[in-house]
């Protein structure tokens, strides 16, 4: 049946053309954006996952920047510590030279003073972005410095930022800006041999041997004793069987000295019936040293110089340990930086598998749709021409 009111063939061809046009728009959008899931309407589940992971990847990018900043801080501190170690080695060399008979110690002291000034200069200059890890205010205890290490999303979806911590304490900073507890400004107390102490408890005597030691001094009331020897308020203390006993040299004329404390806290010193016999503890064996920053060898005897060299060597040991810690932190930051880079690439790859368009497939499909569109246009043209043929019947 041929109708001039309803052209069914033209309607069918037009519907086909509309469908092809819609498919072409979708395919062209995939080709132009490179995404087969560009919005939630395309695939809500994949779009949601991709959006979340892209957000996490942006956070990882910030972590990468923070790791770079942290690496710069650590590298600066390490370089400063390494330079300071070389200077302290030179100071130790000067002290060894000063033990030679007939040496002008005043001249050597002048050289040491210059080296001490260099240590101060290194410590003050080892700063990056306002952060200085070689000197700190330790009056309130250790100070923790942190470097952002990673961004984590757990199984429940909760997010957190993990950090790499580094403690600025008496064994890691060169100078305490308020007190005297840094490696270079604290006093190292050194003994050159073991000391045999006779302890009398209510008339019962027993002997105890305290081995050679190199330990820190106490700087404030209430601080805890550390190690086997400490200096507080001008008094020397030794730790025997977990009891702190105050000792004096034979030069004081005292045959004994009352006990110090029954606990490890300096603020709880009490009188007791303990007595230490110092007859076997000559002055050379229980000696107070100097800080590296306060070294003054003018007029110093051979025994004191030997003890001072041991103290400087103890400071070098602490500095070497601190440099090793900084090196370990630097290595960890480098490893974490590499991991974050790889993790970011993995996330990009995973998101791509979910939402990226296959350009080979899309280009092939676009070519096919263009051919279909041309055929649909031709079909519509043929269908429209059928109505024109009706006019020939009336000629």
UniProtKB/Swiss-Prot annotation:
* Subcellular location, record wording: Secreted; Bacterial flagellum
The primary location reported for this protein is secreted
Organism domain of life: Bacteria
Family annotation (Pfam families):
Flagellin_C, Flagellin_N
InterPro entries recorded for this chain?
A: Flagellin (IPR001492), Flagellin_C (IPR046358), Flagellin_N (IPR001029)
Q: Which UniProt keywords apply?
A: Bacterial flagellum, Secreted
Q: Which GO terms describe its cellular component?
A: bacterial-type flagellum; extracellular region
What is the similarity comment for this entry?
A: Belongs to the bacterial flagellin family.
What's this protein's function? Flagellin is the subunit protein which polymerizes to form the filaments of bacterial flagella.
State the name under which the record lists this protein: Flagellin B
Q: Which organism is it from?
A: Rhizobium meliloti
């Amino acid at each position: 049946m041929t109708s001039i009111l309803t052209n069914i063939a033209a309607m069918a061809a037009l519907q086909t053309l509309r469908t092809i046009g819609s498919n072409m728009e979708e395919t062209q959008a995939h080709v132009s954006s490179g995404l087969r899931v560009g919005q939630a309407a395309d695939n809500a589940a994949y779009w949601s996952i991709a959006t979340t992971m892209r957000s996490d990847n942006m956070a990882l990018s910030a972590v990468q920047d923070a790791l770079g900043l942290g690496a710069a801080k650590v590298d600066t501190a390490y370089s400063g510590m390494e330079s300071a170690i070389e200077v302290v080695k030179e100071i130790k060399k000067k002290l060894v030279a000063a033990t030679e008979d007939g040496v002008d110690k005043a001249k050597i002291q002048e050289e040491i003073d210059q080296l001490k000034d260099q240590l101060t200069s290194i410590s003050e200059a080892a700063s990056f972005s306002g952060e200085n890890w070689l000197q700190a205010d330790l009056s309130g205890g250790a100070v923790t410095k942190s470097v952002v290490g990673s961004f984590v999303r757990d199984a429940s979806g909760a997010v957190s930022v993990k950090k790499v911590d580094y403690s600025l304490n008496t064994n890691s900073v060169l100078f305490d800006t308020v007190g005297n507890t840094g490696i270079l400004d604290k006093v190292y107390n050194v003994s050159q041999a073991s000391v045999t102490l006779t302890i009398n408890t209510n008339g019962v005597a027993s002997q105890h041997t305290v081995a050679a030691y190199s330990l820190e001094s106490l700087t404030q009331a209430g601080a805890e004793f550390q190690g086997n020897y400490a200096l507080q308020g001008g008094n020397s203390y030794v730790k025997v069987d977990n009891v702190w006993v105050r000792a004096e040299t034979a030069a004081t004329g005292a045959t004994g000295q009352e006990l110090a404390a029954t606990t490890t806290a300096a603020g709880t010193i009490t009188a007791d019936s303990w007595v230490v016999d110092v007859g076997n503890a000559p002055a050379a064996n229980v000696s107070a040293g100097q800080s590296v920053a306060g070294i003054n060898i003018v007029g110093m005897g051979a025994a004191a110089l030997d003890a001072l060299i041991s103290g400087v060597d103890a400071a070098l040991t602490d500095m070497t340990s601190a440099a090793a810690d900084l090196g370990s932190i630097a290595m960890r930051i480098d490893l974490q930086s590499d991991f974050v880079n790889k993790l970011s690439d993995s996330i990009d790859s995973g998101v791509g598998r979910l939402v990226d368009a296959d350009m080979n497939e899309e280009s092939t499909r676009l070519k096919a749709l263009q051919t279909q569109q041309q055929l649909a246009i031709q079909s519509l043209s043929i269908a429209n021409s059928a109505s024109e043929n009706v006019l020939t019947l009336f000629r």
